[in-house]
């Protein structure tokens, strides 16, 4: 039955608490709103009341409001977002630099929680839990079987600092289970994955995100590398999706002399704000720098690479970055949820806007990688063309380009082996993981006796033909077979190196992984060669 509006129950026109809250959120100062804005807010409130009181079935008003907010933000730009109360802490965690829990890195192996490594100095490490231990009970309840997944494990092992969780561990060589009562604590979440000497005099730092702890980690990395004789630095920001603006400014400051513009932000409701370098940089007076970027380097990564490029401070090597130059400001909502709303755009010192266009909609925006690949941009610099209006000049007279993202000074085509169907299936079906876990389950102790340090492992360990044959058998069991006519061929030698690198990560840490696998990294080797050829480096800098 359809009721004429005039005959709807009076309760439909009573302002519910939910609508009142929503209206207040959208218009904290209603007098400052235009008539059009006030009418839009009232329209939404009325629509929600009608749905709430007249819809054929019961409705969940908070869910409806959340859905409406999500759609509104989606219509604005690709990066404004709604975050539920339950997800706020999880989303912020990587940038906070820590979380609270027991302090273990784990993987699921044969429906069992396998400790890959305890966090050094963390609560599990202090109690004596070691790599290779299998957690079979949590708080007296079996933690083995098909019900076990990553979410299940994290829900039970993470928790507030000071709370206790009991685990029972099966250890190789021990008949009985070992019980541990672990008092949860703050666990550091590092943003630097690797720090080592890539070549004599050349340091390498891989930064994965711009978090609250990144600068402390960076200073420690620089100190370590200088002790090992570092003069020049390769800063790896590939696939670094960004983080805090202040951290990006502070990192840029490390390389620039005082009073240089690093970045500025500006929006309709936000006046231009300039961010300048200070005189406190640890790398501002000496030492050359190369920044590695790729199509997944975004936001804060683009601020750093853009500032270094615009001031002719170093070289940028790789492929055009993602092109995320929108500033999101968090707004807390009364129920604990959050809006991350775009309030401004980033601009590099020369005035380039980092943000790529998004007028064609969110779906097309996130197809950018596919479009770049199809247009040839990822494999050939000749396929990239910029109109004169997007050209900018640096102080040294070099031409740099706007239009979205940072175009590198030295272009390196994407490694086509990453598109190998065989390699993709090996990863997707978990063949690498299964092989590494089963191999270490049998051989961990023997390897560590023979190679007590990573340096010894790197120099002496070889993935022999028996190991590789076992790996291929594991692949065949998962129905992963290399096609005879494979378009993109992933060499056997590279697969063996990947196995060695993954073993290193499980036996030591992420840094060990990168130090092994980077032996076949074309972008890194190009950066090393440029730093070793001072004449070529200076020429590319315009000096």
Annotate each predicted stretch with a short phrase.
Residues 2, 28-40, 44-61, 84, ...:
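Cleft-lining beta-strand/loop regions that shape enzyme active-site pockets
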Residues 2-17:
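Bacterial N-terminal signal peptides that target proteins for export
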Residues 16-27:
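Bacterial N-terminal signal peptides
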Residues 55-116, 162-194, 517-528, 536-543:
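Extended, small/polar residue-biased N-terminal targeting/export presequences
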Residues 132-134:
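Structural motif
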Residues 300, 312, 319, 323-390:
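Polar, glycine-rich mid-to-C-terminal structural blocks
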Residues 353-354, 358-543:
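Conserved functional hotspot residues or short segments at active or partner-binding sites
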């Amino acid at each position: 039955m359809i009721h004429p509006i005039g005959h709807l129950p009076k309760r439909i026109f009573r302002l519910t608490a939910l609508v009142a809250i929503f209206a207040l959120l959208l218009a904290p100062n209603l007098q400052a709103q235009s008539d059009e804005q006030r009418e839009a807010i009232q329209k939404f409130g009325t629509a929600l009341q009608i749905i709430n009181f007249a819809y054929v079935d019961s409705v969940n008003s908070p869910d409806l409001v959340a859905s409406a907010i999500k759609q509104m933000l989606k219509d604005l730009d690709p990066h404004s977002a709604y975050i539920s109360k339950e997800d706020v802490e999880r989303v912020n965690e990587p940038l906070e630099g820590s979380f609270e829990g027991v302090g273990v890195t784990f993987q699921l192996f044969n429906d069992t929680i396998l400790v890959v490594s305890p966090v050094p100095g963390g609560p599990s490490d202090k109690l004596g839990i070691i790599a290779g231990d299998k957690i079979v009970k949590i708080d007296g309840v079996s933690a083995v079987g098909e019900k076990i997944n990553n979410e299940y494990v994290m829900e039970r092992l993470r928790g507030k600092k000071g709370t206790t969780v009991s685990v029972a561990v099966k250890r190789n060589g021990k008949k009985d289970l070992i019980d541990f009562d672990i008092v949860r604590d703050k666990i550091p979440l590092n943003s630097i994955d690797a720090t080592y000497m890539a070549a004599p005099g050349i340091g390498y730092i891989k930064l994965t995100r711009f978090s609250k702890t990144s600068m402390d980690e960076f200073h420690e990395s620089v100190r370590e590398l200088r002790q090992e004789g570092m003069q020049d630095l390769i800063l790896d920001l590939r696939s670094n999706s960004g983080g805090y603006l202040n951290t990006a400014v502070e990192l840029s400051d490390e390389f620039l002399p005082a009073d240089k513009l690093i970045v500025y932000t500006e929006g309709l409701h936000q006046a231009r704000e300039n961010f300048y370098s200070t005189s406190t940089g640890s790398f501002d007076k000496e030492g050359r720098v190369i920044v590695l970027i790729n199509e997944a380097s975004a936001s804060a990564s683009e601020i750093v690479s853009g500032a270094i490029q615009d001031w002719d401070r170093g070289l940028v090597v790789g492929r055009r970055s993602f092109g995320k130059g929108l500033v999101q400001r968090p707004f807390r909502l009364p129920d604990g949820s959050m809006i991350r709303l775009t309030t401004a755009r980033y601009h590099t010192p020369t005035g380039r806007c980092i943000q790529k266009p998004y007028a064609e909609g969110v779906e097309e925006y996130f197809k950018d990688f596919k479009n770049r690949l199809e247009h040839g941009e990822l494999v050939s610099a000749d396929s990239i063309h910029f109109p004169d209006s997007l050209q900018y000049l640096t102080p040294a007279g070099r031409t740099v380009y706007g239009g979205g993202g940072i175009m590198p000074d030295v272009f390196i085509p994407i490694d086509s082996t990453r598109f190998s169907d065989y390699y993709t299936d090996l990863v997707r079906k978990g063949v690498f993981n299964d092989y590494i876990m089963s191999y270490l389950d049998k051989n961990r102790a023997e390897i560590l006796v023979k190679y007590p340090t990573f340096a010894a492992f790197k120099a002496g360990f070889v993935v022999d033909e028996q190991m590789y044959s076992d790996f291929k058998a594991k692949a065949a069991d998962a129905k992963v077979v290399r096609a005879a006519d494979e378009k993109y061929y992933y060499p056997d030698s590279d697969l063996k190196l990947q196995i060695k690198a993954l073993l290193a990560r499980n036996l030591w840490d992420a840094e060990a992984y990168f130090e092994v696998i980077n032996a076949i990294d074309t972008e890194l080797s190009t950066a090393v060669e440029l730093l070793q050829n001072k004449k070529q480096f200076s020429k590319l800098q315009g000096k």
